[in-house]
A protein has these predicted regions:
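Soluble periplasmic/extracytoplasmic beta-strand elements of cell-envelope proteins
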Residues: 51-56, 64, 80, 101, ...
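Conserved catalytic neighborhood of penicillin-recognizing serine enzymes
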Residues: 107-143, 151, 186
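Active-site SXXK
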Residues: 60, 72-100, 266
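Structured C-terminal helix/loop/strand segments within mature extracytoplasmic catalytic/sensor domains
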Residues: 2-4, 14, 27-39, 146-147, ...
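Beta-lactamase-like hydrolase cores
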Residues: 24-72, 290-293
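Twin-arginine (Tat) signal peptide motif
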Residues: 1-10, 21-24
């Protein structure tokens, strides 16, 4: 059994019972008001703008900061694109083993997986999903969008889930550009993202096997070790999808499963144009530490 297959099997166990049925007696932690206060202080200390929403499925608590304000999706859209692919597989409209052959002309910047697979046998839809989610391969992300009709089709799928906020308008790499304040293109809010992740990973938007596969890809992500993952305590299982545009936007969305049961869903969007990548990572890691206490 391959590494991702083992992770999919493990992830499947996480959905054996509904999320709220796994609740344990609430451990000593921080209430929503204290969490909001800590997030506000983190933003003030770090500079820039920070949008966060946290949902603890074990106790039903929610907390956030600027959670209804819009931020650029950047590569966090790739988790949603992979989920839409899985929804289409569930409906018999797509097959994970469908193979696409492509050329050098299809490549865009940051394509660590696809650049090595030009010509020959190409890649399967499953491989594009894995590359897009676990290594944020931009060409893979574009092929996922192409597979179901482009950004507008992804937005329509999100609307069908009840997400009236998140929208995708462009493909990689243009979707990372933000022209001016008030530009709604390719944006989401932290609250909208958390609610959508809850439906995808713990609701009935996907079949059980597809929920497990999506979770497995998130758990296998290799780009988020210094972000939310770095803040959650040892022993927690974390799956995430990062997003970065290189000009001040740094994001991370995901879910963390504590050993005691339940799950914590987090979306964190950070806009700090004058700060370094290391600074962004530290801010997002602190969000993980705060989220674990809700």
């Amino acid at each position: 059994m391959g590494l991702l297959s083992r992770r999919a099997a493990l992830a499947g166990c996480l959905f054996a019972v509904p999320a709220f049925a796994t609740a344990r007696a609430q451990q000593q932690g921080l209430g929503p008001d204290a969490i909001r206060d800590r997030l506000a202080k983190l933003e003030q200390k770090s500079g820039g703008r920070l949008g966060v929403h946290i949902l603890n499925l074990a106790n039903g608590s929610r907390a956030g900061h600027r959670e209804h304000e819009r931020f650029l999706l950047c590569s966090t859209f790739k988790a949603l694109a992979a989920a839409f692919v899985l929804a289409r597989v569930d409906r018999g409209e797509e097959h994970l083993d469908r193979r696409i052959v492509f050329s050098k002309q299809d490549l865009v910047v940051w394509s660590p997986v696809t650049e090595a697979r030009i010509g020959a046998s190409g890649m399967t839809i499953a491989e594009f999903c894995e590359a897009a989610v676990t290594l944020s391969d931009n060409t893979a992300g574009n092929f996922l969008l192409q597979s179901f009709g482009g950004p507008a089709a992804l937005t329509a799928y999100l609307r069908s889930l009840g997400d009236e906020v998140t929208r995708l308008d462009r493909i990689e790499p243009a979707l990372n550009e933000h022209d001016q304040l008030g530009d709604l293109r390719d944006t989401t809010s932290a609250a909208a993202m958390v609610d959508t992740l809850q439906k995808l990973l713990f609701g009935d938007a996907l079949s059980r096997s597809s929920r497990a596969q999506l979770a497995a890809w998130l758990i296998a992500n290799k780009t988020g070790d210094r972000r939310l993952r770095a803040g959650f305590p040892t022993g927690w299982l974390v799956g995430d999808k990062t997003g970065t545009n290189g000009s001040g936007s740094a994001n991370d969305i995901g879910v963390a499963w504590p050993p005691s049961g339940g799950a914590v869903i987090v979306a964190a969007y950070c806009r700090q144009p004058e700060r370094s990548a290391q600074h962004h990572d530290a801010v997002l890691a602190e969000v993980g530490r705060i989220a674990a206490q809700l």
